[in-house]
Amino acid sequence: MDDQELGFKAGDVIEVMDATNREWWWGRVADGEGWFPASFVRLRVNQDEPADDYEAPRAGAREADDSGPEAQSCKDQMRTNVINEILSTERDYIKHLRDICEGYVRQCRKREDMFSEEQLRTIFGNIEDIYRCQKAFVKALEQKFNTERPHLSELGACFLEHQADFQIYSEYCNNHPNACVELSRLTKLSKYVYFFEACRLLQRMIDISLDGFLLTPVQKICKYPLQLAELLKYTHPQHRDFKNVEAALHAMKNVAQLINERKRRLENIDKIAQWQSSIEDWEGEDLLVRSSELIHSGELTRVTQPQARSQQRMFFLFDRQLIYCKKDLLRRDVLYYKGRLDMDDLEVVDVEDGKDRDLHVSVKNAFRLYCGTTGDSHLLCARKPEQKQRWLKAFAREREQVRLDQETGFSITELQRKQAMLNASKQQATGKPKAVGRPGYLTRHKHPSLPASRPQQQVLVLAEPRRKPSNFWHSISRLAPFRK
């Protein structure tokens, strides 16, 4: 972080010393002062409230003090402030998107000698789709705005009507790390540096690099749950908009969780490709053609027909398929591919301890997988009862995961699959492990000092939705490291 940038965390109250620039403000928190991105924070609704009110846990809307007309009038004013903030930030955001689409995307398309369509898609993602959706959303908000009595405005329904549209942010957020990598590569060449700077100046945009502008949609989708929570706080339970705001808050939290989950899943595909490349004698299509998540893994005894011969195999349950491998007799860290089962065509049946009527052998901690198309069955036995139960629960989770993916439309593109397999092959060639880290979504940008001329205000730092940790390597860590 630059020496002049202000360090802070979610929940801090920052005193704004200068807000002349729309993108970067100068502020003070505790004993430190410095620049911070304005888009990372939001203004407190009531500037007259002491900061302690925000640092303490805030009560819900139903617990607010509604006694007396003065208290209600104050609450109405604070609801008006929240509504004005929502509309103001949306209008600013629309201008920001328009500047990117007209100032950068349109100009880049004119230079076919510098940019291919694939490059433009990598750099800008689906930002033009986001721009179109946001314009419709702002129009709907303005239609619901009560100009004479703003506190009576009913904005909750707008969020509910457009909640499906916000899911397009998932594609943008997942692509953003690729955009940063491509921009970093291009800006090593002076002609691209000059071109991007010319685009910024012609559009009269502030002095921030393009990757800084492209970060805004990632930040924006995280703001909606916070704004709606603030709106709900100052909405009386008897207000006509109360139930809609409550439902909208829940819906936008789900959207944020969906985006985080999709991002987590896409971060896993490189690891899955690396795992596949470590398996000897792999046959058939790549794992990523149908799967993107390791759900469970472990050692099971496979009892085969017709002699009821038992085999120790390592099983890996992914969404839509179950892979089984054989350990090398001498090198136990090496696995050989032995086959796969299509989970879409299997029925899992619990088998009681005792003599199996099909194979006429005694089994314990067993379950059977029936194949609907071929009529084949696979008898598998765990060592302990609790291991068997974990497998049965994992099979149920796998079916639920597939159902959710179908409902939300989650899928891995052909380009993402190819890139993951290419990365895995490169790593295998070098023999060096590739670090898989979290993309730098919160990249800092340096800016020159700005004159202080704005009255002091206080802002509350945004708390972004927490990202669900991946359990891929947690599952893998229970096994020996698989490397050639």
Curated annotation (Swiss-Prot):
<dbReference type="GO" id="GO:0035556">
    <property type="term" value="P:intracellular signal transduction"/>
</dbReference>
<dbReference type="InterPro" id="IPR001849">
    <property type="entry name" value="PH_domain"/>
</dbReference>
<comment type="function">
    <text>Acts as a guanine nucleotide exchange factor (GEF) for RHOA, RAC1 and CDC42 GTPases. Binding of APC may activate RAC1 GEF activity. The APC-ARHGEF4 complex seems to be involved in cell migration as well as in E-cadherin-mediated cell-cell adhesion. Required for MMP9 up-regulation via the JNK signaling pathway in colorectal tumor cells. Involved in tumor angiogenesis and may play a role in intestinal adenoma formation and tumor progression.</text>
</comment>
<feature type="domain" description="PH">
    <location>
        <begin position="293"/>
        <end position="400"/>
    </location>
</feature>
<dbReference type="GO" id="GO:0005085">
    <property type="term" value="F:guanyl-nucleotide exchange factor activity"/>
</dbReference>
<dbReference type="InterPro" id="IPR035899">
    <property type="entry name" value="DBL_dom_sf"/>
</dbReference>
<keyword id="KW-0728">SH3 domain</keyword>
<dbReference type="Pfam" id="PF00621">
    <property type="entry name" value="RhoGEF"/>
</dbReference>
<feature type="region of interest" description="Disordered">
    <location>
        <begin position="51"/>
        <end position="75"/>
    </location>
</feature>
<protein>
    <recommendedName>
        <fullName>Rho guanine nucleotide exchange factor 4</fullName>
    </recommendedName>
</protein>
<feature type="domain" description="DH">
    <location>
        <begin position="78"/>
        <end position="262"/>
    </location>
</feature>
<dbReference type="InterPro" id="IPR011993">
    <property type="entry name" value="PH-like_dom_sf"/>
</dbReference>
<dbReference type="Pfam" id="PF00018">
    <property type="entry name" value="SH3_1"/>
</dbReference>
<dbReference type="InterPro" id="IPR036028">
    <property type="entry name" value="SH3-like_dom_sf"/>
</dbReference>
<dbReference type="GO" id="GO:0030032">
    <property type="term" value="P:lamellipodium assembly"/>
</dbReference>
<dbReference type="Pfam" id="PF22697">
    <property type="entry name" value="SOS1_NGEF_PH"/>
</dbReference>
<dbReference type="GO" id="GO:0046847">
    <property type="term" value="P:filopodium assembly"/>
</dbReference>
<comment type="subunit">
    <text>Interacts with RHOA and RAC1, and APC. Found in a complex consisting of ARHGEF4, APC and CTNNB1.</text>
</comment>
<dbReference type="InterPro" id="IPR055251">
    <property type="entry name" value="SOS1_NGEF_PH"/>
</dbReference>
<dbReference type="InterPro" id="IPR000219">
    <property type="entry name" value="DH_dom"/>
</dbReference>
<dbReference type="InterPro" id="IPR001331">
    <property type="entry name" value="GDS_CDC24_CS"/>
</dbReference>
<feature type="domain" description="SH3">
    <location>
        <begin position="1"/>
        <end position="46"/>
    </location>
</feature>
<keyword id="KW-0963">Cytoplasm</keyword>
<dbReference type="GO" id="GO:0005737">
    <property type="term" value="C:cytoplasm"/>
</dbReference>
<dbReference type="InterPro" id="IPR001452">
    <property type="entry name" value="SH3_domain"/>
</dbReference>
<keyword id="KW-0344">Guanine-nucleotide releasing factor</keyword>
